[in-house]
Regions:
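Short charge-dense sequence patches
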Residues: 1-11, 29-41, 94-103
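Primarily the HKD phosphodiesterase
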Residues: 27-92
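Charge-patterned, long linear interaction tracts outside catalytic cores
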Residues: 159-166
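Residue-level marker of positions within ordered structural domains that often coincide
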Residues: 40, 122, 153
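N-terminal localization/anchoring segments of enzymes in phospholipid and broader phosphate metabolism
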Residues: 1-25, 30, 127-128, 140-158
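Extended interaction regions within the primary functional domain
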Residues: 57-66, 99, 128, 152-153, ...
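HKD (HxKxxxxD) catalytic microenvironment of the phospholipase D
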Residues: 35, 97-144, 148
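Flexible, glycine- and charge-enriched loops at secondary-structure boundaries
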Residues: 13-14, 46-49, 134, 138
């Protein structure tokens, strides 16, 4: 992945899985208050992997008021393939909130990650990994924030951090 330019607004193109992982880690590290992520099941962003979970943990530990909101269509991937992320949710149940999107307004092919209303990563709905990340660009991030917040409010309740079995 190319280095982020010095002067805002800053655009970084994403064309491979390695560039996506580097961009996501950069976005998480730049977030100072809130991180919002929306994807059908979060697997495309590999949020269950060690590095993103470690970065999210560091973000949540940095300030008591920091928040992470994850919006998904299908909880199956989180329940079966993301034990690190679920463990993080158990440790930070007050700050890491996960919701399942409304069936009438699914996330679908939209894959976005937004940090602090200024930085945003968006992937295109293609077979390969193609997307872009903008830093210090509220003009690019604001429509994504509005769309995310609308879906978040219409989504179901927060998903439990503990299994609800007997």
């Amino acid at each position: 992945m190319q280095d982020v330019p010095v002067d805002p607004p800053q655009r970084v193109l994403i064309g491979s899985r390695a560039e996506l992982e580097a961009a996501l880690l950069l976005l998480i590290s730049r977030a100072r208050r809130q991180l919002r992520v929306a994807a059908a099941d979060l697997s495309v962003l590999s949020l269950g992997s060690l590095q993103p979970v470690t970065a999210m943990r560091a973000m949540l530990l940095a300030r008591p008021g920091n928040r992470i909101h994850l919006l998904v269509d299908d909880m199956a991937w989180l329940d079966t393939r993301a034990p690190r992320l679920r463990s993080l949710q158990q440790d930070f149940a007050h700050a890491l909130r996960i919701r399942c999107a409304d069936a009438q307004d699914p996330v679908g092919h939209d894959v976005v990650a937004i940090g602090d209303d200024l930085d945003a990563l968006r992937l295109q709905p293609t077979v390969g990994v193609v997307g872009e990340m903008w830093c210090h660009n509220g003009t690019f991030a604001q429509p994504l924030v509005t769309e995310f917040d609308r879906r978040w409010e219409h989504a179901s309740h927060d998903q439990s951090s503990q299994p609800l079995g007997l």
